[in-house]
Amino acid sequence: MNRLTRSIGAVGVSLLFAGSLAGCGGSSDSAGTASAGPMDASKANLPKTEADVNGTIDKSKVKKSLVVGVDNPYYLFHHDIEVALSKGYFKEFGIDTVEIKTIEDPLPPLIGGSLDLALYDTDTAIAAARKGDQNLRFLSVYLGGEANVLGVGKGINSGADLRGKTITGGQFGSRNDAIIRQLLRDNGVEPDRDVKIVSTGGQSNERLQAVITGTVDGASIQLRHRTVLEKAGGKVLFEETREVPQSGWSATKLLQESPETVTAFLAATLKARQFITDQANKEEVLTIMRAKKFDIPTEYADAYAAENAPAYHVSDGGFKPADMEKFIGDQIAYKTVPEGTDWRQYTYLLPLWRAQKALGLPLNPALADM
């Protein structure tokens, strides 16, 4: 995912946001009311300089209990919250409890109001905002790297061996489906001519098992699956990695009712992420997550350095605008995002900038880059 840059003057026009949100420059949260409607961007107190960003979180305005949705049961998508709870980071910013609900698609309950925030695919959230919920906003990147990996079963050692075989990238129309097709083309294999592409549900763990059991001959899998697949007699045939702001946090009702809470949530989880991406803390993080009953076999633990690298599990929650521009452009081409979508219109970065400033981190994206 990649991006183009625009002048700071464009921020006031393109970063539209729902509700009367707290201004960057002051500590006031008085406009964050549930009754507020979409705000005229000309009235928005958006930051023009870093000095305008208020890094002080008023805990008296923070909601004490939150319910958030995550689409993946793998520990990587839960450990920011569990570590923040374990180490007291949420309480530091005024939040007492956070309940995580694992839901295959957390956007409907987020839009319906039963979730406060959702961790989900960036493009899907932006597309949902464009198509329906005008108050939904993408807030911060969670995973900023993408590994496009084709795992195959026994006896497949080259692109030529794939001819006539069955491959899945997950559900038709998903990003995984699109990028596995591109990976095949990049390696001289034409989808739907040289191989049979099938649609399957579930996450990457289910696709791995489908390869191991022979249900399919190859599938889009994750880096952590390499050792497991090799022990079963398979292998990674093709792979590529790139910077892509593929998933992150979004909010709608909470952003209108209590923008201070959104900032507090991001500050606590980013503080946890700073701890997690410090490789010296690997064993403590894994101990916390195993105590929470997450299944982390040795093969998955061995992938910790790759999956929790600061550029992959983005340590500051930010992104390069050019990467986002490229990503959303690709998704428009894949028809998963409506034609003409301007991602800036459905992205609201003030809570992220405030959280970064609260933690003493540089603002990312930089104001000048937006």
Regions found by a protein language model. Give the residues of each.
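Sec-dependent bacterial lipoprotein signal peptides
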Residues: 1-22
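Bacterial lipoprotein signal-peptidase II cleavage site
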Residues: 21-36
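Short, glycine-/small- and polar/acidic-enriched structural segments
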Residues: 32-200, 217-220, 236-242
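Conserved C-terminal helix/tail region of periplasmic/extracytoplasmic solute-binding proteins
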Residues: 42, 329-370
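Extracytoplasmic/secreted envelope proteins and their assembly/folding machinery
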Residues: 78, 82, 107, 122-125, ...
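Short linear loop/turn motifs
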Residues: 98, 104-106, 196-198, 302-309, ...
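Pocket-lining segment of extracytoplasmic ligand-binding domains
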Residues: 197, 203-294
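Secondary-structure end/capping motifs
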Residues: 258-340
